């Protein structure tokens, strides 16, 4: 199948879940993102995953965030265009405060991802409600007491 130069077709089975995970994670390393996709059984090949991430970065749906993590880990976050694609697809997202301004918030989100992954790997996790969904729900009458980072 041929596509017009500069355009891309998003896979509902592979691209959308990856974009959703980046959005819900706030900040996420490449290794964390691959582990989420592997645990969701949407990606089994690291090579295919890396190609998918490069393609989504190249089209401006995911942003690389250099210098935010120590070591050699690449950190990613959702771009405004990526969030817009997901909102158009029905994703709940009311925005996120202070996520783009403070380096410390990056470390916080990366640690939260590690907690999420550890609970998932141990099979102790029944349901994880991400901050994006909590903040969106808090705009309705069915609200939490505050904007939590996650509800387990």
Model-found features: residue ranges?
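Nuclease-adjacent, charged terminal/linker segments that flank catalytic cores
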Residues: 1-99
